[in-house]
Regions:
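Extracellular/virion structural assembly segments
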Residues: 1-413
């Protein structure tokens, strides 16, 4: 670890001990809630951006233990500069034909791999060129990344006062640096010659991510990524004491003392497999968690068995669920492109089938239908959310959604 004097954040201790360790990235929002007698609710965001923390676990041998003890004991409340390797990119030369050349010293702009353009480097922030724990360089950033149409690379323009001081090979890791402080305590566990450390950094200037507007229905977001039980997804089983009852058809019910009606809820488990998915998950969570922005979520476990499509009518096997989901209908075709429809009426027949009349013609061949499911009106049921970085591009996050006033609020008129 080395000291670095920043023109924006003054003296910082660059914490480079953990670039391959597990990390849990937590975002904490704060909202004010007003509950009505019927259980409906209104939430107001009290923070414009979430408070972020990074919790690390890493090991060092006994030769490093004494030095680390002195650092943590002496600098417990001092400021650190912590690399965020969950947003790391590769350094490249500014022309493809010279992509294996060195990035020479004195550069005031760096080119990074264009395939992951979401480098979360802040204006008037810091970045680190990292090769090893003892071989790195900190630079201050004057501008956000910009797209270079000529060379198809993302250009990170560095502040004029912090040109590179040495040459770096193409492929060097580039990571954002966040000014942080140790928010609680440092735990040191000794086992033989190995010392395990656990500590949490709180970020002083967390970035507000640019929100991507997803698919919408009636100006309300739709989550079309499947996280519930299926051959491609896993339902989390870490349910807590708030469970009130269980229905195999409807899933879990949640009930709290402030609610006069039950809410249908589902626990989610989101697994990302690369940095791009991880970054997209962070943006999606930020959009819907802190502001408790409602969204539509397809009930993937209720896959309707379609018999025939005729203009604005669908013949399907009666599943007994259509009375519950009166509002919207989602259709997913083999191309992966979803179409959404409002349910006008449902007619059940003695032969065990039903006719669903929709708000417009279904211009899709019945053989081209991949998936049909209802849409429920939901929100995330938490102020906080953690993404646990396991390594090698893999992260895991568990969270829960609940329906908003199910079967009591008419959403379409």
């Amino acid at each position: 670890m080395k000291k670095f004097t920043s023109k924006y954040f003054h003296e910082l201790l660059v914490f480079t001990k953990q670039p391959t360790a597990e990390m849990t990235e937590t975002y904490e929002h704060k909202t004010d809630i007003v509950l009505a007698k019927d259980g409906t609710e209104s939430r107001t965001a009290l923070r414009s951006k979430p408070r972020a923390t990074y919790a690390f676990k890493f090991s060092e041998d006994s030769n490093e233990a004494q030095g680390l003890y002195n650092v943590f004991h002496d600098k417990l409340r001092d400021k650190y500069a912590v690399p965020v390797w969950t947003q790391s990119l590769k350094l490249k030369e500014n022309t493809p034909e010279y992509s294996t050349e060195l990035i020479f010293e004195g550069k005031d702009a760096l080119y990074v791999d264009w395939a992951l353009i979401d480098l979360d480097v802040m204006i008037y922030g810091m970045a680190i060129l990292y090769e090893s724990e003892d071989n790195f360089e900190v630079v201050e950033v004057g501008f956000r990344p910009e797209w270079d149409d000529l060379n198809e690379y993302t250009v990170v323009a560095l502040d004029i006062g912090t040109k590179t001081k040495k040459s770096w090979p193409s492929g060097t890791v580039v990571m954002p640096l966040r000014p942080c402080y140790i928010s609680d305590k440092v735990m040191q566990s000794r086992r033989g010659l190995t010392n395990a450390y656990t500590l949490t950094f709180q970020v002083l200037n967390n970035a507000v991510l640019d929100e991507d507007t997803p698919e919408t229905v009636e100006d309300i977001d739709v989550y079309l990524t499947q996280y519930l039980s299926s051959e491609n997804a896993v339902r989390a089983i870490d349910f807590d004491s708030e469970i009130d009852s269980f229905d195999p058809l409807l899933g879990r019910f949640y009930k709290r003392t402030t609610w006069l009606n039950n809410r249908v809820g589902s626990s989610m488990r989101v697994v990302t497999t690369n940095l791009k998915e991880y970054y997209d998950a962070r943006k999606r969570f930020q959009r819907h968690r802190g502001k408790f922005r409602p969204f539509w979520y397809p009930s993937f476990e209720d896959n309707l068995k379609i018999i025939e499509v005729n203009n604005d009518k669908i013949e399907a096997i009666d599943d007994g669920m259509s009375d519950k989901y009166k509002y919207l209908y989602v259709m997913r075709v083999s191309t992966g492109e979803p179409s959404s429809f409002a349910i006008i009426s449902v007619v059940r027949k003695p032969d065990g089938t039903m006719t669903i009349t929709l708000d417009r013609t279904v211009d899709i061949d019945v053989n081209d239908i991949q998936y049909v499911s209802y849409i429920t009106y939901c929100r995330m049921d938490t102020d906080n959310l953690s993404l646990s970085w396991v390594g090698n591009g893999v992260s895991v996050s568990n969270w829960r959604i609940v329906e908003l006033a199910p079967s009591t609020k008419k959403l379409l008129t």
